[in-house]
From Swiss-Prot:
The lineage of its organism: Eukaryota, Viridiplantae, Streptophyta, Embryophyta, Tracheophyta. Keywords: DNA-binding, Nucleus, Transcription, Transcription regulation. One of its GO terms (cellular component) is nucleus. It comes from Arabidopsis thaliana. Pfam families: At2g31720-like. Its main location: nucleus. It is found in: Nucleus. Residues 235-244 have a biased composition (Basic and acidic residues). Residues 49-147 bind DNA. The keyword ATP-binding does not apply. Residues 175-196, 217-244 are annotated as: Disordered. This is Putative B3 domain-containing protein At2g31460. One of its GO terms (molecular function) is DNA binding.
Length: 244
């Protein structure tokens, strides 16, 4: 059994797994801090470090190929479609993209931010979990969900698809429940906390996705990786007009 499976699993994760017949839960990021750039509707993405995503080993070979194919094309092509559950148990379908030095949840992230605009704040800390979705449980909380449901994340997703759960850190990871190799500050030594401001995490400007409005995307923006941009002091991506 994995370290994350042995940990106390948060209630939000367990409820989500029950509703979606989930299996193989795994803690991906013990501490993910929201920065200004994560909540900016013009950047329209939740960015996470490659170290967490790749060291966790939860991606299948087919999923890796899908993500790598999207990265190599460096165009606004589809990434890996995944389910995503916010702290209020609201469900979405997002795309997971791989950039040069990070991964990002895009194509729908703006909707997550809009739905949580009263609760998401810069500096909030969450943990990010993932499990495999086996399909909607026909009966959940006394409600019959058979025959499809408007809120079903499996609509359009295959069984076995990834489902990510964003859990407020105060109810997810506690010092006494961390893996044995974790440090006293509440993070796994093998999976460093993803709470470093992007502007200080990277010392060089690096190829991030400049964002263009997609008229067919009601969620806002899709990335294009043809240009090289750096970070502002607040962690936001420098606009080309200000990049020297």
């Amino acid at each position: 059994m994995s370290d994350s499976a042995e940990m106390q699993q948060p209630e939000l994760l367990l409820k989500s797994m029950n509703k979606l017949n989930g299996y193989h839960p795994q803690l991906i990021i013990p501490k993910k801090t929201l920065f200004k750039c994560d909540l900016d509707d013009k950047q329209s993405r939740l960015q996470v470090s490659s170290m967490h995503m790749e060291n966790s080993g939860f991606l299948t070979e087919d999923e890796k190929r899908t993500i790598e194919a999207q990265k190599m094309k460096k165009r606004r092509t589809a990434g890996l479609r995944v389910a995503f559950i916010d702290p209020e148990s609201q469900q979405y379908v997002l795309e997971l993209h791989k950039w040069t030095k990070s991964y990002a949840f895009v194509k729908g992230w703006n909707k997550v931010v809009d739905k949580n605009d009263k609760t998401f704040k810069v500096g909030d800390v969450f943990s990010l979990w993932v499990f495999r979705c086996g399909g909607v449980n026909p009966v959940h909380d006394g409600v019959n969900l058979s025959g499809g449901h408007a809120d079903s994340v499996v609509d359009g997703l295959e069984q076995g698809s990834l489902c990510f759960v964003l859990v407020p850190a105060k109810v997810s990871v506690h010092d006494g429940n961390l893996p044995q190799d974790s440090g006293h500050d509440g993070h796994n030594d093998n999976l460093p906390q993803d709470s470093v401001e992007p502007s200080s995490f990277f010392d060089e400007s690096y190829e991030l996705n400049h964002l263009f409005f997609d008229q067919e995307d009601s969620q806002g923006y899709l990335p294009d990786e043809d240009e090289d941009f750096g970070f502002n002091d607040d962690g936001s991506i420098r606009d080309s007009g200000h990049y020297q």
